Amino acid sequence: KGSMLLNTLLALALGGIALGLSPFLEFFNLESRLMPLAQPYYYLQVISFVVSMLFNGLKQFYDGMSRTRLPMYITIAGVGINILLNWGLIYGRMGLPEWGLYGAGIATLISRVAMVMLLGLSFFADRSLGKERHGFFAGRLDRSILKPLTLLGTPVAIQLGLETASFTIAVIFVARIGSFALAAHQVVNTVTVLGFLMYYGLGSATAIRVSHYRAIEDYQEAKNVAQAAHQIGIVMAFVAMIVIFAIRGKVSLLFNPDERLAPLVAITLIPVVIYQLGDMLQIVYANALRGLEHVRKLVPISILCHLLVAPILGYLFAFVLMAHYPEWQLLAVWSAFPISLTLIGILLYRDFYKNCNKESFLPKS
């Protein structure tokens, strides 16, 4: 109950900040014809972000009980809905209106709302969760639990939010390049989900197992869990790299029959292939740190990598180095992510092993 309250308040606060920044879109020198497209899409992305945080709050509840299967199925279903609706609403397929970029935003929002509804309905319908439902609705909220929840949960939520913000800023940069680049960007963004889903599932399992060994103060086993997850993650990353590299030339045709889009998507997916290892590292070790309840450095590390390194490099690559080569600017924007994601992965890796000894923790009160 306390976790959902805090998660909702934080989601609304971050969403409000993002909406408050919307007037500054005009300072990114977008084409005048793109401004009417960029603003609605930006608003939809912000709303989707708030809904996504609500889903994550429910998902963590299930993960904490080691019931990871249902959230996984719902997440996969949500991705499928998102892909299908993107195809339908961007290009007017299946009898749906042709809304272009606005349709992409609507598709993302609908899929995330559906995910929240499905997981929420399962909570109310599952008979085995009777005690949890009773505890959720019975009595008043114990305010004493809010502080430790805030200290643990806020950095994790902010870290996820900052990563989302990093990719949202990339959308603004791409919108400045042009509508053709936006179409390719949307395809690339959809393909990136392939690796993320695998790593996020592995990361959730890592957090659960590490938290178990932290509870019994067996930090050697906690390190063993992280090392095993790291090794499994490397295999997953190489599988994702091979698949993405193999489909890069034809995947755009699943979303757009325009064959001119295929070469741009193919070349832009190269940075996505490269950053799979870094993305895996940051997801696995962010979750390992969550299991240790050592999350203080998540925020400064995320600010450095997601709000400074990625946007600054993306801007420099696209609008300084490639200012006179518009055909390479989309690739340049995405080329910032292998650097930022690998950097955050290395920093979180080091932080985990630095703080994984029993002596590094304060005695329990």
Feature names for model-found ranges:
Residues 44, 78, 111-115, 119, ...:
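Transmembrane helical elements of multi-pass membrane transporters/channels
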Residues 13, 46, 50-51, 77, ...:
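Residue-level hotspots within pore-lining transmembrane alpha-helices
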Residues 1-15, 19, 52-71, 184-248, ...:
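Small-residue-rich hydrophobic transmembrane alpha-helices
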Residues 22-23, 60, 87, 91, ...:
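Transmembrane alpha-helix boundary and packing residues in multipass membrane permease domains
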Residues 1-50, 96-154, 210-275, 317-365:
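Short alpha-helical transmembrane segments in multi-pass integral membrane proteins
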Residues 44-63, 71-79, 104-119, 200-203, ...:
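Short runs within selected transmembrane alpha-helices of multi-pass transporters and secretion channels
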Residues 23-32, 88-99, 161-194, 212-213, ...:
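Helix-terminus/linker motif at the lipid-water interface of multi-pass membrane proteins
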